[in-house]
């Protein structure tokens, strides 16, 4: 998801998005640990998306 799309969302929607991303990260980590994950780049993408959402939440809280 692009940062511009995230900036348009409310804080509540961003928190819901963050929760979904954290769950996805957990599932990907479990798949990676059991050797079922074939696209390991997904871990990196989800981690960066989490950082994007957290950054925007922080900037909205300060504004």
UniProtKB/Swiss-Prot annotation:
Superkingdom as given in the UniProt entry: Bacteria
Gene that this sequence comes from: rpmC
NCBIfam families xrefs: L29
Record carries keyword ATP-binding: no
Family named by the database record: Belongs to the universal ribosomal protein uL29 family.
Name of the protein in question: Large ribosomal subunit protein uL29
Gene Ontology cellular-component terms listed: cytosolic large ribosomal subunit
GO BP, sorted A to Z: translation
A Pfam entry, by short name: Ribosomal_L29
Keyword annotations of the record: Ribonucleoprotein, Ribosomal protein
A molecular-function term among this protein's GO annotations: structural constituent of ribosome
């Amino acid at each position: 998801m692009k940062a511009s799309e995230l900036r348009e969302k409310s804080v509540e929607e961003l928190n819901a998005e963050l929760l979904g991303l954290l769950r996805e990260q957990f599932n990907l980590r479990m798949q990676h640990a059991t050797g079922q994950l074939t696209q390991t780049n997904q871990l990196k993408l989800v981690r960066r998306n989490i950082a994007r959402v957290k950054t925007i939440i922080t900037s909205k809280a300060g504004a």
